[in-house]
Amino acid sequence: MSKKLIQLFGRLVAVAALGLGLGQAEAKTKPNVLFIFADDQCYETVANLGHTDIDTPNLDRLAERGTQFTRAYNMGSWSGAVCVASRHMLITGRHIWRAQKAQQVLRGGKKLTDAQKAARDAEFNNLWPQVMGRAGYQTFFTGKWHISAAADKAFQVARNIRGGMPNQTPEGYNRPLPDKPDPWSPYDIKFDGFWKGGKHWSEVVADDAVDYIGEAKQDKRPFFMYIAFNAPHDPRQAPKEYIDRYPLSRIKVPASYLDEYPYKDDIGC
């Protein structure tokens, strides 16, 4: 996993460096775009931002060589989750107050009027990958989609399309149980989740990205790659070598803003 991720981030740095030199190139030159998206990752999990409890050497390299938006905030959601809102805002170009409406238009329904179909098609044609495609880019996607439109239609190439989160065995959530041993293990593949298929989904996404960069070299068009990792969104699973890096004595849990999760009753907690 680490080798593939290092390759991926190394190539991202190279792509970023290419973009920095565009000012001296011809105006018609289009840069390659490699967009990497982690799922629900908080700023407290990046060492470069002053949180050294976690090792993030590749993210640190990108932060040091690029631009950090340290006052950019997720404004929330129309539901108990912020992941779906983040994705719809990015893909549709809508802010939070209009992203839900865009989601509803894209979702459509079984019986739509001609006007509703036209609105859905117009919304779809303005999705980020569609715009990039019309601008002359080869477009590629892998990972978590969670958008109310078909990824394999929005992008020219889409692989290993994942939903909001994987199904998981009850052991991952119903724990710990009083006076009973904890059966859960974040690196045991029998619990499915991110291990479904035998390889951690982060590894799958990284492999897809590295492979496509190699394929894209055969095309004269610049590429737009949307690489969407499901992690660190729950279920909290990772290969053992990464779990072993973080004994409990090293982990500091961030303070909560509320005493209780406001949507706990809705999800059966």
Give, region by region, the residue ranges found by the protein language model.
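Bacterial N-terminal signal peptides
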Residues: 10-21
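Catalytic-site neighborhoods of secreted/periplasmic enzymes
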Residues: 84-198
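Solvent-exposed loop/turn segments at secondary-structure junctions
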Residues: 40-43, 68, 75-80, 96-97, ...
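Loop/turn elements at helix/coil->beta-strand transitions in domains of secreted/extracellular proteins
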Residues: 29-34, 65-70, 133-140, 218-225
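Short, structured active-site-proximal loop/turn typified by the sulfatase FGly-forming signature C/S-X-P-X-R
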Residues: 50-87, 93-94, 98, 138-140, ...
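N-terminal secretory signal peptides that target proteins for export/translocation
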Residues: 1-8
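Sec/Tat signal peptide C-region and signal peptidase I cleavage site
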Residues: 23-27
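Active-site-proximal cap/lid insertion segments
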Residues: 28-31, 38-54, 77, 162-269
